[in-house]
Amino acid sequence: MLVPKRVKHRREFRGKMRGEAKGGKQVDFGQYGLQATTSSWITNRQIEAARIAMTRYMKRGGKVWIKIFPHKSYTAKAIGVRMGSGKGAPEGWVAPVKRGKVMFEVAGVSEEIAREAFRLAGHKLPVKVKFVKREAE
């Protein structure tokens, strides 16, 4: 699973998820992409589940690029612990994804296979998604 090798601060503020993605809105590496149409945090487990769903459907054919990385930690207190006495322990890692961001790209497969692979991957993610093609240069 994707996790940072080391971080400067173990506990981060949650932050705001306003507006669109600044960059990464086009298909850069592959022929087809999976674009988020809503904003959310995506955990490293959800990214891995989507990747497995895509690669299994494509039967190891083609190439997959993951264009998001879970660099933000989130914390949680243990069950049954009262409020107060500091922030909880780091629980996991998330990638903040804003609307418009292309999260996955594929190349080397037909459009029908790519569409179905992205449909299966979209069911594993907490955001609404759409299929996008690379723009002709």
From Swiss-Prot:
Highest taxon, organism lineage: Bacteria
Gene Ontology, cellular component aspect: cytosolic large ribosomal subunit
Pfam families reported in the protein's UniProt record: Ribosomal_L16 (PF00252)
Gene3D superfamilies linked to this entry: Ribosomal protein L10e/L16
Record flagged with keyword rRNA-binding: yes
Record has Hydrolase as a keyword: no
Keywords, sorted A to Z: Ribonucleoprotein, Ribosomal protein, RNA-binding, rRNA-binding, tRNA-binding
InterPro entries according to UniProt: Ribosomal_uL16, Ribosomal_uL16_bact-type, Ribosomal_uL16_CS, Ribosomal_uL16_dom, Ribosomal_uL16_sf
Record GO terms (molecular function): rRNA binding; structural constituent of ribosome; tRNA binding
Biological process annotations from GO: translation
Assembly and interaction partners: Part of the 50S ribosomal subunit.
NCBIfam families hit by this protein: rplP_bact
Protein role: Binds 23S rRNA and is also seen to make contacts with the A and possibly P site tRNAs.
Family that this chain belongs to: Belongs to the universal ribosomal protein uL16 family.
Record HAMAP family: Ribosomal_uL16 (MF_01342)
Protein name per UniProt: Large ribosomal subunit protein uL16
Organism per entry: Streptococcus suis (strain 05ZYH33)
